[in-house]
Amino acid sequence: MFKTLTQNLTKIFDKLVSSGILTEAQIDAAMRDIRVALLESDVALPVIKDFIAEVKQKALGQEVIKSVSPGQMIIKIIHEEMINLLASSESETKLNLNSKPPVNFLMVGLQGSGKTTASSKLALRLKNQNKKVLLVSLDTYRPAAQEQLAILANSVQINSLPIVQGEKPLDIVKRAIAEAKISAYGVVIYDTAGRTQIDKEMMEEALAIKKIVEPTETLLVIDSMTGQDAVVTANSFNEKLEISGLILSRIDGDSKGGAALSVKYITKKPIKFLSSGEKLTDLEEFDAERLASRILDMGDIISFVEKAASIVDREEAEKTAAKLKKGKFDLNDYLQQMRSIKKMGGFGSILSMLPGSGKIMDQIDQSKLNSKIIEHQEAIILSMTLKERENPDIINASRRKRIAAGAGTTVQKVNILLKQYKQISEMMKKASKMNPKNLLRNGIGKLFS
């Protein structure tokens, strides 16, 4: 989501670091460049103004001007201020589950914000924490909205309140309250109706629901793709409903990222979760330091390790590592890596969590290693014999023609796969010889140099 902002800030940081001793004029110029980068990313103007003022005040301090590496000191200040911009106390960011059961959560937001998906993701997260969860759809306006929630709930074996056609939202709430008591649910998540825009009727209905439900949390789902409109939306909901926290959806989208940097600062309400993709497991607890590090191209190694640990088969990973140490990496290993990459959201998603990735993200985009390409490559590799997978060098022109026919593709696509395999094979072998500390310190850009 922050690709453009990350790349623009990386260029500014490179200038600062390469300058050696910094003058006040150079710091002023850097602040102007940062201001432009934030404006282009749809960060709200009041946020930019206060952020730049804080950074500049600290950057002009004597300890920075006289430091051995003033450029690095300013980058450190920017990192700290970005954390301050995004952060809330730990007690605020954690989901409040301390009420007497059933604990009620009210999900609000505009239509199309990803609210229903976020409700289901939250339900799955709580189910995995051994909570008995009931999902309740109050959206009687959007066609098939109630059915959508029921399908999502059923896909992960979570109960949803049975649908009664023609029932009004407030009547659904009363039925849900009774069901929660009878069946001893620990958590009830109410998915309210959205609108294409904020209106008086929508807010009055949501307020009436809130009075009956008495939720422990009122969570506003904000679409990160909406830019500065997200701030207006967040303010309106907060004024009328007094929200307790925010969930930012579609953070994996190709948006400018300004919403994430603005909504918390403007509303003074904590960001609790980041939602990405359609998979119900794609919900992560918000961590200001991790996100700030990702935006500033310092990486988010903790998220990377957590995600990898939940997906990668440890035994297979150890086998691959042992082979790499011996300088071996065949097409079976390549296929295994591609499948893991696909599960983790694609190559771009992985790289965005590693330090130094900002400088090579365009290069990675051009490689087009998305999920569909990986599926096509999987079909090509599975059309090869075991001997060909273990010894790619034997794949001559006639073998390539046979493989292409077996995979239902062209020889050109087979050639592209073999070329990418060779490049990644060299990169993997290079990485296996590097000191892990140096790899993290220097960033993954070194692998491509």
Swiss-Prot record:
Entry EC number(s): 3.6.5.4
Pfam families: SRP54, SRP54_N, SRP_SPB
Keyword field: Cytoplasm, GTP-binding, Hydrolase, Nucleotide-binding, Ribonucleoprotein, RNA-binding, Signal recognition particle
GO cellular component labels: signal recognition particle
UniProt keyword Metal-binding, yes or no: no
Catalytic activity: GTP + H2O = GDP + phosphate + H(+)
Cellular location(s): Cytoplasm
Disulfide pattern: none
Alphabetized GO MF terms: 7S RNA binding; ATP hydrolysis activity; GTP binding; GTPase activity
Keyword Cell cycle applies: no
Any GO BP: SRP-dependent cotranslational protein targeting to membrane
PROSITE patterns, sorted: SRP54
InterPro entries associated with the record: AAA+_ATPase (IPR003593), P-loop_NTPase (IPR027417), Signal_recog_part_SRP54_M_sf (IPR036891), Signal_recog_particl_SRP54_hlx (IPR013822), Signal_recog_particle_SRP54_M (IPR004125), SRP (IPR004780), SRP54 (IPR022941), SRP54_GTPase_dom (IPR000897)
Bilayer-spanning residue ranges: none
Binding site for GTP: 109-116, 191-195, 249-252
Main EC class the enzyme belongs to: hydrolase
Assembly and oligomerization: Part of the signal recognition particle protein translocation system, which is composed of SRP and FtsY. SRP is a ribonucleoprotein composed of Ffh and a 4.5S RNA molecule.
Domains as described in the record: Composed of three domains: the N-terminal N domain, which is responsible for interactions with the ribosome, the central G domain, which binds GTP, and the C-terminal M domain, which binds the RNA and the signal sequence of the RNC.
HAMAP family linked to this entry: SRP54
Record's function text: Involved in targeting and insertion of nascent membrane proteins into the cytoplasmic membrane. Binds to the hydrophobic signal sequence of the ribosome-nascent chain (RNC) as it emerges from the ribosomes. The SRP-RNC complex is then targeted to the cytoplasmic membrane where it interacts with the SRP receptor FtsY. Interaction with FtsY leads to the transfer of the RNC complex to the Sec translocase for insertion into the membrane, the hydrolysis of GTP by both Ffh and FtsY, and the dissociation of the SRP-FtsY complex into the individual components.
Similarity-based family: Belongs to the GTP-binding SRP family. SRP54 subfamily.
Record's protein name: Signal recognition particle protein
Organism: Rickettsia felis (strain ATCC VR-1525 / URRWXCal2) (Rickettsia azadi)
Gene behind the chain: ffh
